[in-house]
Amino acid sequence: MTNIRKTHPLLKIINSSFVDLPAPSSLSSWWNFGSLLGVCLGVQILTGLFLAMHYTSDTATAFNSVTHICRDVNYGWLLRYLHANGASMFFICLYLHVGRGLFYGSYTYSETWNIGILLLFAVMATAFMGYVLPWGQMSFWGATVITNLLSAIPYIGTDLLQWIWGGFSVDKSTLTRFFAFHFLLPFIVTALVMVHLLFLHETGSNNPTGIPSDPDMIPFHPYYTIKDILGFLVMLTALATLVLFSPDLLGDPDNYIPANPLTTPPHIKPEWYFLFAYAILRSIPNKLGGVLALVMSILILAIVPILHTSKQRSMMFRPLSQCLFWLLVAILFTLTWIGGQPVEHPYIIIGQTASVLYFLIILFFMPMVSMVENYLLKW
């Protein structure tokens, strides 16, 4: 008799995705981040759902409703801090997942990679709108500054901005629509995740060597299910430690001051996970140029497959490319640091140098070094 998991219309989809899925035998821990992102998304949707039951999206009561959640709702403080720090864990896993894709050449699966870029944009939009909801000082001014960038778009910028605001400034209608979109987007993200997995399972997973692994496959369960569960435990332990010991470590103290349109905080900055892009935005003295650089800092991932000039897929056996990759990582850390600093000397020039290097490495140095490595292979 055939097992029900292989015949049942619903169970066989789950079976072919998580049980009998053939997987390369050499996958390292860098392949854990996909499943960790799934757990992060689940945690965010669950905690967000319970928070939404107590939150009110009105400028008069939003800040107080968050205070009420933390003080009066059973384990409301836990829900709030799990949700806020869960977003940080989400982005840590996201950036490591993208970094893994860049290092091991996973971007050659173009459909999976492009859906991944769409997912990155969707998650960033969700996180930005979520940061506005507590209606603290940094929420309000962050929303004002970032949405204001749309006014740099020629001809339609100002009209588009007022349409998004629902008025002439960030106000009640802006908060209400941001809450609606913040609630809706995670479900769109979930649908995109399914498409991402669909395309991934069409080709099968890449592996650290970058060499086709068809002759050497193992079933996903029990080998990688156990490995993923270990990853869950490590990540959830880190999240629990952050939430229970230092919940405000990654937040901004200004957000504990209710939003006031009449006083501007000394340093307006987004959450830490957007600082690298914010630093690139601030490095360009022109408004439209800054906005284009900001968008391109993420969208540049879409042209990485076109710029792949190496004869090898993975960087595992390419030491020169590895040096450039880790230099790129160092530059991203530098940009993240600069994004949190005030706009003054020497931070301005450091930010501009790092921004130029970021684009140069991806667009010019990496393809060039790959060609040099191809030449060295002939020796």
Curated annotation (Swiss-Prot):
Heme b b566 binds at H97, H196. The chain crosses the membrane at residues 33-53, 77-98, 113-133, 178-198, 226-246, 288-308, 320-340, 347-367. Its cofactor is heme b. GO terms for biological process: mitochondrial electron transport, ubiquinol to cytochrome c. Gene3D superfamilies: Cytochrome Bc1 Complex, Chain C. It is found in: Mitochondrion inner membrane. One of its GO terms (molecular function) is metal ion binding. Heme b b562 binds at H83, H182. A ubiquinone binds at H201. It comes from the Eukaryota. PROSITE patterns: CYTB_CTER, CYTB_NTER. One of its GO terms (cellular component) is respiratory chain complex III. Keywords: Electron transport, Heme, Iron, Membrane, Metal-binding, Mitochondrion, Mitochondrion inner membrane, Respiratory chain, Transmembrane, Transmembrane helix, Transport, Ubiquinone. It is a multi-pass membrane protein. The keyword Transferase does not apply. Binds 2 heme b groups non-covalently. The keyword Heme applies. Component of the ubiquinol-cytochrome c reductase complex (complex III or cytochrome b-c1 complex) that is part of the mitochondrial respiratory chain. The b-c1 complex mediates electron transfer from ubiquinol to cytochrome c. Contributes to the generation of a proton gradient across the mitochondrial membrane that is then used for ATP synthesis. The cytochrome bc1 complex contains 11 subunits: 3 respiratory subunits (MT-CYB, CYC1 and UQCRFS1), 2 core proteins (UQCRC1 and UQCRC2) and 6 low-molecular weight proteins (UQCRH/QCR6, UQCRB/QCR7, UQCRQ/QCR8, UQCR10/QCR9, UQCR11/QCR10 and a cleavage product of UQCRFS1). This cytochrome bc1 complex then forms a dimer. Heme 1 (or BL or b562) is low-potential and absorbs at about 562 nm, and heme 2 (or BH or b566) is high-potential and absorbs at about 566 nm. Belongs to the cytochrome b family. This is Cytochrome b. The lineage of its organism: Eukaryota, Metazoa, Chordata, Craniata, Vertebrata.
